[in-house]
A protein has these predicted regions:
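Basic, amphipathic alpha-helical patches used to engage nucleic acids or provide basic targeting signals
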Residues: 53-64, 71-75
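Short, low-complexity, polar/charged sequence segments that are solvent-exposed and flexible
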Residues: 29, 58-62, 97-100, 113
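A broad structural signal for short, well-ordered beta-strand segments within beta-sheet-rich domains
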Residues: 2, 7, 36, 56, ...
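Active-site metal-binding core of divalent-cation-utilizing nuclease and nuclease-like domains
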Residues: 2-34
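Short alpha-helix boundary/capping segments
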Residues: 49-56, 99
Length: 134
């Protein structure tokens, strides 16, 4: 899919004030032949893995792109992992389902409440990122 897409943005600062103020520096955004934007973030790490923070970061980029460019944005993105191996670097593209705008706004509001001291931090993912059974 990315092979046939064109590079839309690279190492670009993006921001929006709607639905809440958000900003970031997206690694790459690709535009498919159908005109849909797909965010991509590159991570150098010891193993090929997608973290909760990666999903949140790409989800924020998705919401910003929706509001800044007013064009369709995929509900998924890609995490490109770069890992060192004995024979050199290994690069993997991991397609990742992103959070809805509603969930991103909810996380933003919780973050603001924690920053202002109104709320004590605790897990709120509802099991989206880990098992809730112990």
């Amino acid at each position: 899919e990315l092979r046939t897409a064109t590079l839309f943005l690279s190492e670009q600062d993006i921001a929006t004030s709607l639905p809440v103020p958000m900003h970031g520096r997206v690694d790459q955004v690709y535009k498919t032949k159908r005109g849909v934007l797909i965010p991509l973030d590159t991570k150098s790490r010891p193993m090929t893995r997608v973290y909760e923070s990666d999903i949140i970061q790409l989800s924020v980029y998705r919401i910003i792109l929706l509001h800044q460019y007013n064009v369709p944005v995929a509900n998924y993105g890609y995490v490109r992992t770069v890992t060192e191996t004995s024979t050199g670097e290994r690069v993997r593209y991991i397609k990742t389902k992103l959070l809805s705008e509603r969930k991103v706004v909810k996380l933003w509001r919780r973050y603001q409440s924690i920053r202002s001291g109104l709320v004590t931090p605790s897990c709120t993912c509802g099991g989206d990122f880990h098992s809730t059974s112990r």
